[in-house]
């Protein structure tokens, strides 16, 4: 039965210290090991020579490996373990940080520039300095963990072709893309708020999508507008008027009658007159003012009163007067905001027994 030769590690004596002349051949790698210094061809030759099974062949292979290991310094066990695990020792961490920063800068530059321009720049840089290395160059074994220029260009092209992936955070985008996405979100939010506000009026009434909610102010034009005026005033005012009362004011002073229209619907009306008072000065009188309850608190009443006053001023008016119920706080506030003052209290002025206040506005 053939004897199995003992392993080289158990028979060979420990390696002798390296000669001073061999110090110049040491490996420049801080985490250098015997496997990093030997090339693949040398390892293959050693395996071929030691594969014959004779003790002499094993001793020759062991001696050759020992001689190759003398060229690299022995490192502490923890650094050897880092080298075996693919980690970079403390001595090369600054090189890795510099390489990472350089790769980020190159990726951003290639993403901003066209593909052709980036390729031409890379080619010119390689041809201009063939023998020089960049100041922060990294050894080949450390570069394997970093993405190359071609990979960065491919990632930038993928981000440009797939905006949805970049928007979801799958690909790191530039600051300009982030600003554009933020502006787009703001525009979408503002458009949604505008749509929600335009489809609902201030009183909560739903509006149809194609309906025009713009308030228009027009002057009285024809008898066809009389039913709308009567409907508004009869519904909102406590004092009933006959058709003759309306015609007295509107037919004699049509230039002092204004309507507020929303689409084809009349939502507000004012009826006034202007004549001589005691043969001394011209007095304007606001006889009726009504606004639909669904459209109140939109400034319609104020705008109608202003238009009537401007028309009276064009007719050389000296003062404007009106009467309103003493309990109608909203009407009193509207007129007082326009400069009217309380002139006189009229007791039991209306048919329902409520007192009235006479308000006056002096124009001269």
From Swiss-Prot:
- What PROSITE patterns does the record tag this protein with? GNAT
Q: What residue spans carry the Low complexity bias annotation?
A: 152-164
UniProt region (Disordered), positions on chain: 1-21, 39-65, 110-164
Family statement: Belongs to the acetyltransferase family. MAK3 subfamily.
Q: Which PANTHER family match?
A: N-ALPHA-ACETYLTRANSFERASE 30
Question: Which is one GO molecular function term here?
Answer: protein-N-terminal amino-acid acetyltransferase activity
Q: Which residues form the N-acetyltransferase domain?
A: 216-364
Please give the name of this protein.
N-alpha-acetyltransferase 30
Instruction: Indicate where the modification Phosphoserine is found in the sequence.
Output: 39, 54, 192, 198, 201
Q: Which residues carry this modification: N6-acetyllysine?
A: 235
The record's note on quaternary structure and interaction partners says: Component of the N-terminal acetyltransferase C (NatC) complex, which is composed of NAA35, NAA38 and NAA30.
Instruction: State which gene encodes it.
Output: Naa30
Free-text function comment from the UniProt entry = Catalytic subunit of the N-terminal acetyltransferase C (NatC) complex. Catalyzes acetylation of the N-terminal methionine residues of peptides beginning with Met-Leu-Ala and Met-Leu-Gly. N-terminal acetylation protects proteins from ubiquitination and degradation by the N-end rule pathway. Necessary for the lysosomal localization and function of ARL8B sugeesting that ARL8B is a NatC substrate.
Q: Which organism is it from?
A: Mus musculus
Might you give the EC number(s) for this enzyme?
2.3.1.256
Q: Compositional bias of type Basic and acidic residues: which residue ranges?
A: 126-135
The subcellular localization recorded is: Cytoplasm; Nucleus
């Amino acid at each position: 039965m053939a004897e199995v030769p003992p392993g080289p590690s158990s028979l060979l004596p420990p390696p002798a210290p390296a000669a001073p002349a061999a110090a110049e051949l040491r490996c420049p790698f801080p985490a250098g090991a015997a496997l990093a210094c030997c090339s693949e061809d040398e390892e293959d030759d050693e395996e071929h020579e030691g594969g014959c099974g004779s003790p002499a062949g094993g001793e020759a292979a062991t001696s050759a490996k020992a001689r190759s290991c003398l060229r690299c310094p022995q490192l502490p066990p923890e650094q050897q373990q880092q080298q075996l695990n693919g980690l970079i020792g403390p001595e090369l961490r600054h090189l890795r940080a510099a390489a990472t920063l350089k790769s980020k800068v190159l990726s951003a530059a290639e993403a901003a520039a066209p593909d052709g321009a980036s390729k031409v720049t890379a080619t010119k840089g390689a041809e201009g300095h063939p023998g020089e290395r960049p100041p922060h160059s990294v050894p080949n074994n450390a570069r394997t963990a970093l993405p190359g220029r071609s990979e960065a260009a491919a990632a930038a092209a993928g981000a440009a072709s797939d905006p949805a992936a970049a928007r979801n955070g799958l690909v790191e985008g530039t600051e300009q893309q982030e600003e554009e996405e933020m502006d787009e979100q703001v525009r979408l939010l503002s458009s949604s708020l505008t749509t929600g506000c335009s489809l609902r009026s201030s009183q909560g009434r739903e509006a149809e999508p194609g309906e025009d909610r713009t308030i228009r102010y027009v002057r009285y034009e024809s008898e066809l507008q009389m039913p709308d005026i009567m409907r508004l005033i009869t519904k909102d005012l406590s004092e009933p008027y006959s058709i003759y009362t309306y015609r007295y004011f509107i037919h004699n002073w049509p230039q002092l009658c204004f309507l507020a229209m929303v689409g084809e619907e009349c939502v507000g009306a004012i009826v006034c007159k202007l004549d001589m008072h005691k043969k001394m000065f011209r007095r304007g009188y606001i006889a009726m003012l009504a606004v639909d309850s669904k459209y109140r608190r939109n400034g319609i009443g104020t705008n109608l009163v202003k238009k009537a006053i401007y028309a009276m001023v064009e007719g050389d008016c000296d003062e404007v007067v009106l009467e309103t119920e003493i309990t109608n706080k909203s009407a009193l506030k509207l007129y007082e905001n326009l400069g009217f003052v309380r002139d006189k209290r009229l007791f039991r002025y209306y048919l329902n027994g409520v007192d009235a206040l006479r308000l006056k506005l002096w124009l001269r």
